[in-house]
């Protein structure tokens, strides 16, 4: 695997919100910083995430900002239809690469 193919994964909690925002931001920052700047993908697995509130959206936006600053990519994997809709109506969908293992 070359440096350009570096991928790290992070499982999002069932509820991504006020209580979990700091933890996921810290974990994401650690993973992003562990990859060479200018390369790598951080995959946030949303398979088991059922609820995202405004604090959770804010955490995702901050993670995305960290990645952009480091020229890295954030992938949201397996978001539910509700989370996809939330990302769409808040105009955040296009900030992320969204993947489904079911595609």
Predicted regions: what is each one?
Residues 1-51, 62-103:
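STAS-like cytosolic regulatory interaction modules
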């Amino acid at each position: 695997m070359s440096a350009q193919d570096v991928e790290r994964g992070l499982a999002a909690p069932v509820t991504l919100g006020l209580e979990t925002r700091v933890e996921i931001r810290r974990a994401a920052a650690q993973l992003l910083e562990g990859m060479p700047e200018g390369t790598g993908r951080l995959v946030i697995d949303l398979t088991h995430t059922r609820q995202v509130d405004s604090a959770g959206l804010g955490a995702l936006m901050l993670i995305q900002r960290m990645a952009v600053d480091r020229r890295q990519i954030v992938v949201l994997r397996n978001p539910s239809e509700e989370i996809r809709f939330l990302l769409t109506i808040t105009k955040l969908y296009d900030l992320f690469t969204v993947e489904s293992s079911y595609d």
